[in-house]
From Swiss-Prot:
Subcellular location: Golgi apparatus membrane
Provenance organism: Homo sapiens
Residue positions with a glycan: N97
Protein name, as recorded: Transmembrane protein 59-like
Annotated InterPro entries: Uncharacterised_TMEM59 (IPR022065)
Regions that span the bilayer: 268-290
Physiological role: Modulates the O-glycosylation and complex N-glycosylation steps occurring during the Golgi maturation of APP. Inhibits APP transport to the cell surface and further shedding.
GO CC annotation, single: membrane
Length: 342
């Protein structure tokens, strides 16, 4: 305190102005509080508790303590609160001791002075192990089975739509090099403006190197016109993810919009084709179940008299006719053997 009293008034005023506003006024609402947890209570504990040096170090560093040093320690403590929330959010660990260890290790890595490390560790221990809003939400709100199934189904549908959109939506880029060393990039992105319009727009991006480093680029975007006029030129097409130009017009993210941007056809044509395809498939499925009338085999039941007549007077002989010997053939040869000579 004697050193503070001996300071000139201008220097003391500069120290008071240089102190961070966190030490004098409560901080504003944290936008990351819903995800990481609220740290207001932890920061209030940091401001209320004395974060000065330990009693063993009071005689050595007591003379050098100033409002600025206290503000630095309070800032380190508040940073420890936030580091604990970040470690808990990243690790998702149910063991608070593991998160405390990670937070203290982060404090040691962030600060060099021992007093600041201790203040940061104090912030780690002051932050609650679980966010209070999340605890209240778990107690008050019971999970619903139907709602969870609905959320799962909606998440699955969104994943399928996003994967289809990522597969369908692509950008074609044309690269040309002029005589003066400039590289002209033609990038197409089909956009359907009205129901009767087919095609897309074409944007010309002129890229110029300004220096030896690849980062020194000068990009100029120039809308050229409809894409149908440029398709006549035979240019080598190369798909690339570099030098992409985002469209300023809002685009829909549904399946028909993706197919419309991909093919350049209006949405109503794609919807009609899809509807007609479904009707044709239904008609084919129903037509295969009905067989032609000529292919049916009709069996009429026989009466008792018809059955007897069918058995007694058959239309065909039951036995094959006997075979008659041919008259023109030679008589059989009779062989006589002398048994005494054998």
């Amino acid at each position: 305190m004697a050193a503070v009293a001996l300071m000139p008034p201008p220097l003391l005023l500069l120290l008071l102005l240089a102190s961070p506003p966190a030490a004098s006024a409560p901080s504003a609402r944290d936008p990351f509080a819903p995800q990481l947890g609220d740290t207001q209570n932890c920061q209030l504990r940091c401001r209320d508790r004395d974060l000065g040096p330990q009693p063993s170090q009071a005689g050595l560093e007591g003379a050098s303590e100033s409002p600025y040093d206290r503000a630095v320690l309070i800032s380190a403590c508040e940073r420890g609160c936030r580091l604990f929330s970040i470690c808990r959010f990243v690790a998702r660990s149910s063991k608070p001791n593991a998160t405390q260890t990670e937070c203290e290790a982060a404090c040691v890595e962030a600060y060099v002075k021992e007093a600041e490390q201790q203040a940061c560790s104090h912030g780690c221990w002051s932050q609650p192990a679980e966010p209070e809003p999340e605890q209240k939400r778990k107690v008050l709100e019971a999970p619903s089975g139907a709602l969870s199934l609905l959320d799962l189904f909606s998440t699955l549908c969104n994943d399928l739509v996003n994967s289809a959109q990522g597969f369908v939506s692509s950008t074609w880029t044309y690269y040309l090099q002029t005589d003066n060393g400039k590289v002209v990039v033609f990038q197409t992105q089909p956009i359907v403006e009205s129901l009767g319009f087919q095609g897309g727009r074409l944007q010309r991006v002129e890229v110029t190197w300004r220096g030896s480093h690849p980062e020194a680029l000068e990009v100029h975007v120039d809308p050229v016109g409809p894409l149908d006029k440029v398709r006549k030129a035979k240019i080598r097409v190369k798909t690339s993810s570099k030098a992409k130009v985002e469209s300023e017009e809002p685009q829909d993210n549904d399946f028909l919009s993706c197919m419309s941007r991909r093919s350049g056809l209006p949405r109503w044509i794609l919807a009609c084709c899809l509807f007609l395809s479904v009707l044709v498939m239904l008609w084919l499925s129903c037509s295969t179940l009905v067989t032609a009338p000529g292919q049916h085999l009709k069996f009429q039941p026989l009466t008792l008299e018809q059955h007897k007549g069918f058995m007694m007077e058959p239309d065909w002989p039951l036995y094959p006719p006997p075979s008659h010997a041919c008259e023109d053939s030679l008589p059989p040869y009779k062989l006589k053997l002398d048994l005494t000579k054998l």
